[in-house]
Amino acid sequence: MAAGSGVAPPPLGVGLCAVKVEEDSPGSQEPSGSGDWQNPETSRKQFRQLRYQEVAGPEEALSRLWELCRRWLRPELRSKEQIMELLVLEQFLTILPRELQAYVRDHCPESGEEAAALARTLQRALDGASLQSFATFKDVAESLTWEEWEQLAAARKGFCRESTKDPGSTVGPGLETKAVTTDVILKQEMSKEAESQAWLQEVSQGKVPVFTKCGDTWEDWEERLPKAAELLPLQSSPEEQGRTAIPHLLGVSKDESDSKDNEFENSGSLVLGQHIQTAEGLVTNGECGEDHKQGLHAKCHTVKPHSSVDNALGLLESQRHFQEGRPYKCDNCEKRFRQRSDLFKHQRTHTGEKPYQCQECGKSFSQSAALVKHQRTHTGEKPYACPECGECFRQSSHLSRHQRTHGSEKYCKCEECGEIFHISSLFKHQRLHKGERPHKCEVCEKSFKQRSDLFKHQRIHTGEKPYMCFVCERRFSQSATLIKHQRTHTGEKPYKCFQCGERFRQSTHLVRHQRIHHNSVSGLRVEKQHGNLLSW
């Protein structure tokens, strides 16, 4: 890596790990405000997941892709080689087989070569495992849970049953070997969430003992697993079938299977530390000096509690939200949503993204529905009509507010402007007509009619400029000022004079231009009109 004092590009975030980047030449500096850029992984996902339905047309779709790609790749900070390395690494992780992809991503490779080395290491391990001593189908079946057995194809189940009739039959080379080996590998790669859920299902029925410190009981653990039985309802039929089907596959009688189940069920309610009378005899534990069944009590001192206990507690919370119908959570504010699309829309409130722009005035919105409502101010459309009096409104909320005047006395109309308000809000509204300014700045004591105007004014004192131009990184305290500034980059002129067709970037320029036509109608000479223009 070249020596220098420059600042390297920011890390790429979780999921797609950072690429090794050379430092810039001495004296180079990161552009001001670059620290305010959002997480590159978030930008990458926005670039990859942009849908055509979210934009107004093909031109806007192309423009959005350019903007999102630039936010992700940061060409002002990275060289061409570094950008190519980033793209190749991402595509390499995408095309990897699923079992390799998860392993490589977990190790966070910093370059394509490192990712390839990790993939090769795992591939060799998997290939070596398939060449080891053959495992019998009985061994494979013993390692399968009931859920995994149910997921096996019917043909593979039949093949396993035929093979287990011969106790010495092995999983030989061929298609069947590959199929069963894949199942075993998938089992070993089960996620912690799935493992936690299976463990909770067994614990909630008392089928397995919970190993904690010596002397703890199952009742001690019930407090740590609140409402486990409610959150993890078990269906009896698959579980009961599992007690007979899989033992029968292994050649174990139903009585033997039931006796083993009863052994676990009873041990779940025992105090860990009591004597367990079995034919295997008792041994004295060297740590606590008590006699216990060999192997069972020893786990209290040698084995930590189930590795998924902490994950299981988190799983309970996740399942509760899933059953309530809000499975999608925002990582920034932890607010939950029913639909993934609602989560994407909400995340724009954190990123400040406003992809929907009005072609008439250039105002941008984060939601397409807000753009549709805004466009009615230009078209004059009023699609919502009152069925009682026939009055029409632009928005459904305005219609709902109007309909209250027909059926309730709690809502009154302002005599000054005709708007409808609740009685408690009407008095506040009337202050505006009286010239009252109830919202006062504590710094300069300037007063405002609206609270939102006060918030905007306070940014003058705090110096806060939350709105940034992604082209030149200049920042502004007002969103309207940012919109006007962005037109200097796009060349957009949304304000059109309907008399001569000339267009302008700002509404004030249009108003100043329209005075020319007004003076012409008033009978003034053209020379005087040009003189007024020069004097402005």
From Swiss-Prot:
Q: Name one GO cellular component term.
A: nucleus
Give yes or no: UniProt keyword Ribonucleoprotein.
no
Task: Please state the span of the N-terminal signal peptide per the UniProt entry.
Answer: none
Under the heading Pfam families, the entry gives:
KRAB (PF01352), SCAN (PF02023), zf-C2H2 (PF00096)
Which residue ranges have biased composition labelled Polar residues?
A: 26-41
Q: Where are the zinc fingers (C2H2-type)?
A: 328-350, 356-378, 384-406, 412-433, 439-461, 467-489, 495-517
The record's keywords, sorted A to Z, are: DNA-binding, Isopeptide bond, Metal-binding, Nucleus, Repeat, Transcription, Transcription regulation, Ubl conjugation, Zinc, Zinc-finger
Q: Which GO terms describe its biological process?
A: regulation of transcription by RNA polymerase II
* Compartment(s) where it occurs, according to its Swiss-Prot or TrEMBL record: Nucleus
Xref: SUPFAM superfamilies: beta-beta-alpha zinc fingers, KRAB domain (Kruppel-associated box), Retrovirus capsid dimerization domain-like
Where is it chiefly localized? nucleus
InterPro entries named in the record? KRAB, KRAB_dom_sf, SCAN_dom, SCAN_sf, Znf_C2H2_sf, Znf_C2H2_type
Biological role stated in the UniProt entry: May be involved in transcriptional regulation.
State the PANTHER family in the record. Answer: FI01424P, ZINC FINGER AND SCAN DOMAIN-CONTAINING
Q: What is this protein called?
A: Zinc finger protein 394
Upper lineage: Eukaryota, Metazoa, Chordata, Craniata, Vertebrata
